[in-house]
Amino acid sequence: MQKAVYLVLLVFTSMCWAQDSSFLAVVRVDYSSTSGKEDTQFSLDKERHIFFIESDNKEELLFYNAFLKENEESHSAGTIKSVKRIKNTKAQQVYSFEWNFENSYDAIKSKAFVTLEINESETTNKESKAIITITNEKDLQLVYKGIILYYVNPLLFYYRLEKII
């Protein structure tokens, strides 16, 4: 599993360099639900990950919801807009933002509203966790929970989010 994570980071890093972008955070999804119905096994089978990526010119933040399993590659990707800070404590940060996205699998373009909750590890040997809730204009609600596999730097991550508030 760890080898797969490194491979994913290598592939996406290469893609980001080609597009003049850099990673801010990567979340491995360990739990998922669609409109209240748990579908965790689907996300695990497809190796769902969430990526926060910054463009090299520092003008845009991108949000990717991607399947990484070989021969199953598909994603929804787009820009983050209108970030609002809801909570900011040492143990927890909560943000909401608009996400203008396009799906690779059906070319649909739309807007969704995202809440990002980050629960920081209380000790240095535990991983921080994220809860991501995505709601679209048709009231579809997606909930993803998982471990933050990669942070470029937690302070930089928060700074970049807050810069576009």
What are these regions (language model features)?
Residues 42-79:
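N-terminal, post-signal-peptide region of Sec/Tat-exported proteins
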Residues 20-26, 58-62, 89-102, 126-131:
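Short, hydrophobic/aromatic-rich segments at coil-to-beta transitions
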Residues 19-42:
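Tryptophan-anchored aromatic micro-motifs
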Residues 1-23:
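Bacterial Sec-dependent N-terminal signal peptides
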Residues 54-55, 87, 118-122:
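Short, low-complexity Ser/Thr-rich regulatory SLiMs
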Residues 95-152:
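Helix-rich interaction surfaces within compact, conserved domain-sized segments
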Residues 66-117:
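Contiguous, well-ordered beta-strand patches that form the walls/edges
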